[in-house]
C-alpha cells in the first residue's frame, strides 16, 4: 500500500488559473512580426514559421502592424496558435509616409515595455516575413 503523501508526490501537478505556473524568463518570449502587404502566404504557413522560430518558448505576446497582407496572416496565425496578439496600426493620416516606420519603432518600444514585466531572461524575437522597404525599418 502506498501512503497518500507519497502517492500525491507521484501525481502530476494540478494547476488552475488561480495558481499560475511561473516559468523561468528564458522560457518566455515576446515576438514582433511584420511583412509586406503583398504577401499571400496562408496563415498556417505563417504559424509554422512562428512556431519554429519560437523554439518551444512560451509566447507572451505577438505584436504586428495590422496592415493587409502579412500582418493579417500573422494575426490569423496568432489566433490559430492561441497567442495574445497586439495590433499596432499605423497613423497614416497623422504621419503620412513616415507612419509605417514610426509604427514599427512604436511596436519595438511596446515590446520592450512588455519584456520589462517578464522575468529576467525573457527574450524578444523580431521576425520579418518577405516584404517591402517598409519592413526593413522593423529591423
Where are these regions (language model features)?
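Acidic/glycine-enriched connector segments
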Residues: 2-139
Amino acid at each position: 500500500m502506498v501512503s497518500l503523501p507519497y502517492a500525491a508526490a507521484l501525481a502530476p501537478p494540478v494547476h488552475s488559473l488561480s495558481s499560475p505556473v511561473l516559468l523561468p524568463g528564458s522560457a518566455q518570449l515576446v515576438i514582433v512580426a511584420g511583412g509586406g502587404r503583398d504577401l499571400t502566404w496562408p496563415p498556417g504557413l505563417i504559424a509554422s514559421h512562428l512556431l519554429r522560430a519560437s523554439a518551444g518558448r512560451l509566447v507572451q505576446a505577438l505584436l504586428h502592424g495590422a496592415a493587409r497582407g502579412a500582418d493579417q496572416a500573422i494575426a490569423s496565425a496568432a489566433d490559430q496558435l492561441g497567442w495574445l496578439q497586439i495590433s499596432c496600426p499605423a497613423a497614416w493620416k497623422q504621419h503620412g509616409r513616415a507612419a509605417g516606420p514610426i509604427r514599427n519603432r512604436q511596436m519595438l518600444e511596446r515590446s520592450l515595455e512588455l519584456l520589462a514585466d517578464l522575468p529576467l531572461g525573457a527574450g524578444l524575437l523580431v521576425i520579418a516575413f518577405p516584404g517591402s522597404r517598409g519592413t526593413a525599418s522593423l529591423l
